[in-house]
Amino acid sequence: MNVSAGIFFYSESTNRYLFLLRTDKNQSWSIPGGKIEKDETLYEGLIRECREEISIDISNYKIIPIQQFVNNTFVYHTFFCKVKEEFIPILNDEHCGYAWVLKNSYPKPLHPGLFNTINFDLVRDKLKLIEGN
């Protein structure tokens, strides 16, 4: 079974979230993340994906699990990371742009999987709860 993970970055100073514009044919907006390799733990894979996609090391940040979605072919884990200030991500070739946006002002089009995650009441409630902590 394929395992993937993504992470919401939330800036305390601006109350905004980081989104990345994918370079694939659909050019949808997503969050940092990707496939976890067979020899990695979930957190090791998430750390690697953040280094590869936005050149940030999250190994010393508090990472909070938000959701696990499971179907017949894959498992997708969603995480949350609060940062003090917005940062400028150094993008790899998987992305061609980024934006820090306010909640409920998400860029469009969202990647379909992320759209479903954001519109899941439990995820919205968890994000709201941990934004304030």
Task: Label each region the model flagged.
Residues M1-Y17:
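Conserved N-terminal beta-strand and adjoining loop/helix that marks the start
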Residues N2-S4, I31, T73-Y76:
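Short connector loops at helix/strand junctions that flank enzyme active sites
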Residues F9-S13, R22, C81-V83:
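Active-site beta-strand termini and strand-to-loop segments that position acidic
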Residues E12-N15, D24-K25, N72:
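Short strand-connecting beta-turns/loops that link adjacent beta-strands
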Residues T14-L21, E86-L91:
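Short, well-ordered strand-loop elements centered on a beta-strand within folded domains, enriched
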Residues F19-P32:
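N-terminal first-folded block
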Residues I36-I118:
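Unchanged
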Residues F115-N133:
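Charged phosphate-binding loop/patch that engages nucleotide di/tri-phosphates or the phosphate backbone
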